[in-house]
Amino acid sequence: MQYQGRSKRSKTGARLRPRSKKSKSELGREPTETTVGEPRFRTVDVRGDAEKVRVLSTNVVNVATDSGAERATIEDVSANDANPNYARRNIITKGAIIETDAGTARVTSRPGQDGQVNATRVDE
């Protein structure tokens, strides 16, 4: 868990007095780094009695084309602007360029938040 509330120090370094104790709503979670592999999912309880599906790993992508959408198999992550190391480690995030059996595609969904990987074709 990561605390995402106000810092105990101001930007000049002075101590800030707490307004209240830390609350559960100020906690965050570690990022889900979706990898290429056998499909694995995890459900997480979130606010409002809801659930969020996180993709831990997958090898399937929904590729949108001009004529519709098709299901394709992910072969490799060729580039990832979020972090150069993500491409080396085959981690899929929004905006990543992936190689599929249907061609090169850019990921448009957030796999750690949406529970699936959607992408659009990239013409080279």
From Swiss-Prot:
One of its GO terms (molecular function) is structural constituent of ribosome. One of its GO terms (cellular component) is cytosolic small ribosomal subunit. Residues 1-40, 102-124 are annotated as: Disordered. Keywords: Ribonucleoprotein, Ribosomal protein. InterPro entries: Ribosomal_eS8 (IPR001047), Ribosomal_eS8_CS (IPR018283), Ribosomal_protein_eS8_arc (IPR020919), Ribosomal_Se8/biogenesis_NSA2 (IPR022309). Part of the 30S ribosomal subunit. This is Small ribosomal subunit protein eS8. The lineage of its organism: Archaea, Methanobacteriati, Methanobacteriota, Stenosarchaea group, Halobacteria. The gene is rps8e.
